Design a protein with these regions (language model features):
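Glycine/serine-rich phosphate-binding loop and adjoining beta1-alpha1 elements at the start
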Residues: 2, 76-164
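An N-terminal-biased, well-structured beta-alpha scaffold segment characteristic
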Residues: 2-102, 106
């Protein structure tokens, strides 16, 4: 199966659907992986890192791919690039996304990651809501610390503890 990882087009989105480490696992499982040129740059993954693990860099990750992995749902003309019988996995915001009917009319299967069960099960390690909320919370503390003009009282991190 060919798995395509296109560049994210949502303004401000700096994530990429797969890291070189993840791509290596997909290739080891027997899949072909194509990465759209520059797809990982905003997430600090250069094209050569993907090439080193066996991925092919392309100008169009949609062509020939049976499975598309994205962080955010495709919009507008991106949807038109999806061939019939393609499967796409992304965060779709399904309760507010007005373009979902287009996937069905093109015979495209869409899996909304944010609707995966959030229970103690095998799917828990794929729970994007908890993992992304955890990262957002961590980042918010770092941003607040950068803006705060004094030392935080008792800062505990993986690198150690700074007492007041």
């Amino acid at each position: 199966m060919q798995i395509g990882i296109p560049t994210e087009t949502v303004v401000g989105e700096s994530r990429v659907a797969a890291t070189p480490e993840t791509v290596k696992k997909l290739i080891s499982a027997g899949h072909n992986v194509v990465i759209e040129r520059g797809a990982g740059v905003k997430a600090a993954y250069i094209d050569s890192a993907y090439e080193q693990v066996g991925a092919k860099i392309t100008d169009d990750a949609y062509t020939g791919s049976q499975l598309i992995l994205k962080v955010r749902a495709p919009k507008g003309e991106e949807i038109q690039k999806l061939a019939a019988n393609t499967t796409i996995v992304a965060m779709f915001d399904p309760y507010r996304n007005t373009e979902l009917d287009q996937f069905a009319s093109q015979n495209v299967s869409a899996f909304a990651l944010e609707l995966l069960p959030r229970t103690l099960s095998r799917a828990q390690n794929m729970d994007v809501l908890s993992s992304q909320a955890n990262l957002a919370g961590y980042k918010s503390v770092l941003l607040a610390a950068a803006e705060y003009q004094r030392m935080f009282p008792m800062l505990m991190t993986a690198a150690g503890t700074v007492k007041p």
